[in-house]
């Protein structure tokens, strides 16, 4: 029987790394236009999905603005405010969206050192693997200003990873983020299925004529670590929801996932249990760099606290919906 995209498949269960390659540079997405690939992937399984009701929208303009939520005064991830000796924990400020993505919203006194180490690890890995060329191209202001790196590795391998280094002025920067099936917590999608639906793209500056000067006829997007990417989206949603909802009113369903260290290559088959996209809810054109919208997700006579996270909304990237807990 032919397999349909969206069907459970033990052979791919736990796959962490995905990328998209261009073997024909004439097929690159048009400059400055949202696109998607692959376009000929065949039939896919449609799942019943929940309904999101937005209650409050937080927008992030292209120019970074420093803002603060109320101090949390305990670790937003593990819930602790004291160590094993009963002494007050040292708590640091938690950026809702990583500062390197040009966002300035912080929650003071919200992360213990142990949890901060884990979140910093997956945020730092994603910066290097996915976001650094985008940060440079858009001149996003991070903690130390605009990224100073001037050369980035370009994957030119067909079957295996093979890197070439190209000056940033000619580096073919194409933003690639996964479009997901609905999360299993608010849809009929099987819990053991973790493939992306497709990839949403935005060509920032990839010019076939320029690439030919480097004798390149093929290249790939950065490999997306789906586990760490899901951790990032869940962390953004969880931190903002913890500020919006009174902590005593809901029980988090993603905090343990966020503060679990998944070393590179380690399997994980539950990272998309609470993180996904909605097919029946179309994303509108947006002038905002990023968006966070808090609300509820209704599914099977249940209403769950949920958050919509949309990074690079102005580039047409998808919204991710996270069920962050239960009331």
Regions found by a protein language model. Name each.
Residues 185-327:
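C-terminal, charged low-complexity interaction regions
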